[in-house]
Amino acid sequence: MPLLKRLVRLIAIAIFAPVIFLLGCQSKLIYYPNPYRVEHETLLREAKGTRVRFTTSQGAQTAFYIPPRAAANGLPQTIWLCFCGNGSLALDWLHSTDGWDERFAYLLVDYPSYGDCAGKPTPGRIRESGKAAFAALTQHLGATPQELQPRTAVLGHSLGCAAALMAANDLDVRHVVLLSPFTTMTDMGRLVLGWPLCHLNLHRFDNHKTLRQVASHAGASIVIFHGAEDEVIPPRMGRELAAAHPQVVTFHEVPGAHHNDILALISGRIGSAMTAVAGTALQ
């Protein structure tokens, strides 16, 4: 009997230890927040950017507004809300923006715990930050949401695709560019952990669902780029998302591109797609 009890105990430990581990440290497997460095301040200053401060349930948050390089009267013709990957920071977008349309303005949004932002990230809190950042931008520009909404587009990479789609859905944004999107976080868990551990996922980002909602908006125009050699999020996920909405979504698989180098490799193509997607706002 003692031997049987020991065996049962060992089996229970073998079953529940991974479960407890995954539930306890799941956020650390998904999010990789970092503080800003001196070089980021230099990038912000060179771009003539300003901080846009706001508060959410997670405390004080900071996004960054980058004005158009081209002089313009009144509000910018297009404002891109940009959401980075889970290991990047909002100001990292500034390595690319100089090569894109000079009429574009940008609101670079960090997640809770990233950069200068307090709190801890979850899908709901990231969604809250996107909405609150947009509201803060309207005040910063002295505009109304109704004035900014038709001028707004979203751009996301990796995890930022989920954030961008949530913002697009919440703000009724029709112009979307996504780089290396996943289908759902549970699908990603299946790749990394297998079944059934993938269903322990507490951070249930669902790009299938959100993309379907955004694609249903009249006039929606969505472009997806995905590296053919992406070693983190397989390109079949990007293809699957696009295939569900062929009338609205254009898919580009990029030969030779990996997960973290796609932005640098095809920055020019991305910029051209952004100009095309936002064409109605730029006319």
Segments predicted by a language model, with ranges:
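Alpha/beta-hydrolase fold nucleophile elbow
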Residues: 143-158
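Hydrolase active-site cap/lid region
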Residues: 161-214
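Short beta-strand/loop motif that positions the catalytic acidic residue
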Residues: 214-219, 223-230
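C-terminal catalytic histidine-bearing segment of alpha/beta-hydrolase fold enzymes
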Residues: 236-283
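Membrane-embedded segments
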Residues: 60-136
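An N-terminal hydrophobic leader/cap segment in hydrolases
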Residues: 7-54
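Glycine-rich nucleophile elbow surrounding the catalytic serine of serine-hydrolase chemistry
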Residues: 155-166, 232
